[in-house]
Curated annotation (Swiss-Prot):
Mg(2+) 1 binds at D295, E308. Its EC number is 6.3.2.4. This is D-alanine--D-alanine ligase. One of its GO terms (biological process) is peptidoglycan biosynthetic process. It comes from the Bacteria. It comes from Enterococcus faecalis (strain ATCC 700802 / V583). The gene is ddl. Binds 2 magnesium or manganese ions per subunit. ATP binds at residues 169-224.
Length: 348
């Protein structure tokens, strides 16, 4: 069978996607599959690369360009294609895409339209989970605890910033965190200690999205639960992000690889169980399928607050999601195989 590995993308998380794709390429079972590379450039061009039957020798195979003339064709050149040309009979798409235009339902909807099976969550779950505001409103209805928050629209901010300040400061206490509603991997996130910083943080968040969310800052540990399955949902024991900074940013998480993890997290058994139950409930409520990672805050009083649910978590070989499953006895290559089978079962 052919796996179409779709990676790159137009979002700010383009580079994370390339790292994740390389990890998948090195772990997939080539005795069962061939892998067709399809790269989406930062400006949205789709480039069909080589068909691989074995592990690549280096990462350069992923950095595709397209030739304008036959003379320009090089070792890592690809063919520029229209998105619909991705369609193939008896193939499955593995979209290792993060952030907007990747895990927000857009690619998923396109795959549904051309009737191709794909790994991961469907349109509804992807769209809802990508939007931090929508996630919070939906999960409130099933009683999953979350920190207090204030949604802010860019139009309201431009029209009456004073009212936005008053709303935020009337509901929350500094420090707060400001985030774009539709972005991941700590992109566009700021910790804020006063009104002046709040103004700067909102301007930064609105660079990435027309909607932002302001959340109450709390002293807490960060623990994460990995989720796997369609109707039969499984969860891992929590892992913990161990850090010595105010919050870990995009570079720390992916580029510099400076995040320290504790797997499993050192938490009471009842806390671990509660985190697993909340993660499963959130996954089911959002109509999850395939995979997700659910992130929580854990206070010194062992109170859990759901932070977010990621339908396509970082998938590098040093990312939390695969490491959590490895701790449960499911190695990376077998995890990839299970995700492929879950996708095929969903499309039967």
């Amino acid at each position: 069978m052919k796996i179409i590995l779709l990676y790159g993308g137009r979002s700010e998380e383009h580079d994370v996607s390339v790292l994740s794709a390389y990890s998948v390429l090195n772990a997939i079972y080539y005795k069962y599959y061939q892998v067709q590379l399809v790269f989406i450039s930062k400006d949205g061009q789709w480039v069909k690369g080589p068909l691989l039957s074995e592990r690549p020798q280096n990462k350069e195979v992923l950095h595709l360009t397209w030739a304008q003339t036959p003379e320009e064709t090089g070792e890592f050149s690809g063919k520029r294609i229209s998105p619909s040309e991705i369609y193939e009979e008896e193939a499955i798409v593995f979209p290792v895409l993060h952030g907007p235009n990747g895990e927000d339902g857009t690619i998923q909807g396109f795959m549904e339209t051309i009737n191709m099976p794909y790994v991961g969550a469907g349109v509804l779950a992807s769209a809802n989970a990508m939007d931090k505001i929508m996630t919070k409103y939906l999960l409130q209805t099933v009683g999953i605890p979350q920190v207090p928050f204030v949604p802010v629209l860019r139009s309201d901010w431009k029209g009456n910033p004073k009212e936005v300040f008053e709303k935020c400061e009337g509901s929350l206490i500094y420090p707060v965190f400001v985030k774009p509603a539709n972005m991941g991997s700590s992109v566009g996130i700021s910790k804020v200690e006063n009104r002046e910083e709040l103004q700067e943080a909102l301007e930064e968040a609105f660079r990435y999205d027309a909607r932002a969310i302001v959340e109450q800052g709390i002293e807490a540990r960060e623990i994460e639960v990995a989720i796997l399955g369609n109707e039969d949902v499984r969860t891992t024991l929590p892992g913990e992000v161990v850090k010595d900074v105010a919050f870990y940013d995009y570079d720390a998480k992916y580029i510099n690889n400076t995040i320290e993890m504790q797997i499993p997290a050192h938490v009471p058994e009842e806390v671990a169980h509660q985190a697993q139950e909340y993660a499963k409930k959130a996954y089911i409520m959002l109509d999850g399928s395939g995979l997700s990672r659910c992130d929580f805050f854990l206070t010194s009083k062992n109170e859990l607050f759901l932070n977010e649910l990621n339908t396509m978590p970082g998938f590098t070989d040093f990312s939390m999601y695969p490491l959590l499953w490895e701790n449960m006895g499911l190695k990376y290559s077998d995890l990839i195989e299970e995700l492929i089978q879950l996708a095929l079962n969903r499309f039967k």
